Regions:
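Juxtamembrane/disordered regions of integral membrane proteins
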Residues: 1-165
Length: 165
């Protein structure tokens, strides 16, 4: 714990740098915009979802309540005719960017604290190990930020091209 307190400034600066760079990537350079698509009949899709009174949450098409139903003939037909999809519905109203950005910064801070903790446990605060500690912090951070979407590509059909961005 003392090592983390000694590293408070690098931890905070690292979280701020990641936050600022990620904000630039998403809001200024719009790196991921090409990954999102709209429906040609968006108004009809929105009306259908509203008609179902769906609460905020995650939904899957086609839906089955268990593996037995998923393996049934009716479900096989639904899969064959499509569409197959995963939908996340948020609460109605404008997006609260302040809250989202605040939570994103807290996540950046959390990743940095975990990486610093691991490095301090392995190498202490000895300046002779700074290069090795930096490599470890970089690897842990890369895994935390970069590998989280692999499961989405495997299970939810997100394009694998997202993994390289």
């Amino acid at each position: 714990m003392n090592a983390l307190l000694a590293l408070w400034l690098p931890i905070l600066l690292s979280a701020v740098v990641v936050f600022v760079i990620s904000s630039l990537v998403h809001m200024v350079f719009k790196w991921h915009n090409s990954e999102y698509h709209g429906f040609t009949n968006e108004d009809a899709v929105r009306a259908a979802i509203r008609a179902g009174n769906a609460a905020p949450g995650q939904y899957v098409l086609p839906y089955s309540k268990d593996m037995k139903e998923m393996g049934g003939e009716a479900m096989g037909k639904k899969y064959a005719e499509g569409p197959i999809g995963f939908v996340t519905l948020a609460a109605n109203g404008p997006m609260n960017m302040g809250r989202s950005l605040g939570l994103w910064f807290l996540y950046c801070l959390f990743v940095t604290v975990v990486a610093a903790f691991l490095a301090s446990q392995l190498f202490g605060l000895d300046h002779g190990h700074a290069r090795a500690a930096g490599k470890l912090v970089g690897a842990v951070s890369f895994i935390a930020y970069g590998f989280g979407k692999i499961a989405d590509s495997i299970w939810m059909g997100h394009p694998c091209s997202r993994l390289t961005r």
